[in-house]
Amino acid sequence: MVATPSISSQTKGVVRQVIGPVLDVEFPAGKLPKILNALRIEAKNPAGQDIALTAEVQQLLGDHRVRAVAMSGTDGLVRGMEAIDTGAPISVPVGEATLGRIFNVLGEPVDEQGPVNTKDTAPIHRAAPKLTDLETKPKVFETGIKVIDLLAPYRQGGKVGLFGGAGVGKTVLIQELINNIAKEHGGVSVFGGVGERTREGNDLYEEFKESGVINADDLTQSKVALCFGQMNEPPGARMRVGLSALTMAEHFRDVNKQDVLLFVDNIFRFVQAGSEVSALLGRMPSAVGYQPTLGTDVGELQERITSTLEGSITSIQAVYVPADDLTDPAPATTFAHLDATTVLARALAAKGIYPAVDPLDSTSTMLQPSVVGDEHYKTARAVQSTLQRYKELQDIIAILGLDELSEEDRLTVDRARKIEKFLSQPFFVAEIFTGMSGKYVKLEDTIAGFNMILSGELDDLPEQAFYLVGNIDEVKAKAEKIKSEK
């Protein structure tokens, strides 16, 4: 809880210049606000309409002036208006009362559900946890999704990049992860919509309500808080909304001692917003026109996303890659912070393999014997090598047909196709579309299942029995059903 100084003790300044989202404010001598303090402007514009604007101090210019970035539109702002130094950074509500609600960058509810029932707030700027407070032992975060747990496992308190185009299942994967952490880990999630389409944010909210992740009748039973600063917002809001969502997640980790899932969609827009205001703040642009503080900006956000001895924040971040150029400074800087990458492939979605996670392109720093154990590591590598061989043989199959392959290669293709099908899985949040009940698969069941396919134990089962099932027992049951129907 951060105490805000009373209005009478707050310093008042005067707006002297407005350039787009950036404004200069003059204060009395010796009364300049601190960097990152929130300034509040409440006045009427020349047309008689009310203006209520919050801006964040970014620079001290000299001559008793500061330069600040507005968190909402500056239309109607004129020189001479009064600005009040709140004496503290932007603060947002935190705690259970945020679950099931939608907020803007300032922590104001925008879902027309009335005020937030909490007095607890926290500033969006704070230092990353100390090294002595960090949980340094790598621990795998079980998601219950076979392809992720086996081939690109997530680290508890780690950061995951989610790469995928439109319509390949990013949103459904995000929803399933939120659902699984709520049910299996008793945890909560925070979703930060950074500079993406407002329609997508609305669709996500409606889907959360349909799937029960947000309980519209009893918000206290909800498992996710949402924080949006979308495409239509000024760059100041898009630059800070990620921090607002992170602050809500930090409270669940540090105060409630919970494991939290933080989704950021899209991390590139956070960088893009910083780039937009950088030139207006008078900074010299750096490589490809990005802000010279790019590394610092990304680092300040990413270093706060971590595991402590109290709990963890595991972050899943959608990463837009401009012009598919992975060497662009924005994605390149982000990559340095990621522990795992989950790549969604349109070719797999077209085959009906859901989740459409590419088993060969997705990577994780956790997939090493010292972390996951020898059995898991060997199984994962054997699965990848079988799929890789199948990929190499596809050209030959397309030209000459399956019959021209050697006996060994035919067996490899048969097992690879079963593996590919077995990597699919019905999701809880997709039950209303598929009519199939969702499956959460334990890691040991996943490893055992793939080992049985690789060893040839299941060579006599039909390929279709492996499609959209949970563990290997369900495969056998489905095979029996297929056999009896013939």
Swiss-Prot record:
<keyword id="KW-0813">Transport</keyword>
<keyword id="KW-0139">CF(1)</keyword>
<keyword id="KW-0472">Membrane</keyword>
<dbReference type="InterPro" id="IPR000194">
    <property type="entry name" value="ATPase_F1/V1/A1_a/bsu_nucl-bd"/>
</dbReference>
<comment type="subunit">
    <text>F-type ATPases have 2 components, CF(1) - the catalytic core - and CF(0) - the membrane proton channel. CF(1) has five subunits: alpha(3), beta(3), gamma(1), delta(1), epsilon(1). CF(0) has four main subunits: a(1), b(1), b'(1) and c(9-12).</text>
</comment>
<keyword id="KW-0067">ATP-binding</keyword>
<dbReference type="Pfam" id="PF22919">
    <property type="entry name" value="ATP-synt_VA_C"/>
</dbReference>
<comment type="function">
    <text>Produces ATP from ADP in the presence of a proton gradient across the membrane. The catalytic sites are hosted primarily by the beta subunits.</text>
</comment>
<dbReference type="InterPro" id="IPR055190">
    <property type="entry name" value="ATP-synt_VA_C"/>
</dbReference>
<dbReference type="Pfam" id="PF00006">
    <property type="entry name" value="ATP-synt_ab"/>
</dbReference>
<dbReference type="InterPro" id="IPR005722">
    <property type="entry name" value="ATP_synth_F1_bsu"/>
</dbReference>
<feature type="binding site">
    <location>
        <begin position="164"/>
        <end position="171"/>
    </location>
    <ligand>
        <name>ATP</name>
    </ligand>
</feature>
<dbReference type="GO" id="GO:0031676">
    <property type="term" value="C:plasma membrane-derived thylakoid membrane"/>
</dbReference>
<keyword id="KW-1278">Translocase</keyword>
<keyword id="KW-0066">ATP synthesis</keyword>
<dbReference type="InterPro" id="IPR020003">
    <property type="entry name" value="ATPase_a/bsu_AS"/>
</dbReference>
<dbReference type="GO" id="GO:0005524">
    <property type="term" value="F:ATP binding"/>
</dbReference>
<comment type="similarity">
    <text>Belongs to the ATPase alpha/beta chains family.</text>
</comment>
<keyword id="KW-0547">Nucleotide-binding</keyword>
<dbReference type="Pfam" id="PF02874">
    <property type="entry name" value="ATP-synt_ab_N"/>
</dbReference>
<keyword id="KW-0375">Hydrogen ion transport</keyword>
<dbReference type="GO" id="GO:0045259">
    <property type="term" value="C:proton-transporting ATP synthase complex"/>
</dbReference>
<dbReference type="InterPro" id="IPR036121">
    <property type="entry name" value="ATPase_F1/V1/A1_a/bsu_N_sf"/>
</dbReference>
<dbReference type="InterPro" id="IPR024034">
    <property type="entry name" value="ATPase_F1/V1_b/a_C"/>
</dbReference>
<dbReference type="InterPro" id="IPR050053">
    <property type="entry name" value="ATPase_alpha/beta_chains"/>
</dbReference>
<dbReference type="InterPro" id="IPR004100">
    <property type="entry name" value="ATPase_F1/V1/A1_a/bsu_N"/>
</dbReference>
<keyword id="KW-0793">Thylakoid</keyword>
<dbReference type="GO" id="GO:0016887">
    <property type="term" value="F:ATP hydrolysis activity"/>
</dbReference>
<keyword id="KW-0406">Ion transport</keyword>
<dbReference type="InterPro" id="IPR027417">
    <property type="entry name" value="P-loop_NTPase"/>
</dbReference>
<dbReference type="InterPro" id="IPR003593">
    <property type="entry name" value="AAA+_ATPase"/>
</dbReference>
<dbReference type="GO" id="GO:0046933">
    <property type="term" value="F:proton-transporting ATP synthase activity, rotational mechanism"/>
</dbReference>
<protein>
    <recommendedName>
        <fullName>ATP synthase subunit beta</fullName>
        <ecNumber>7.1.2.2</ecNumber>
    </recommendedName>
</protein>
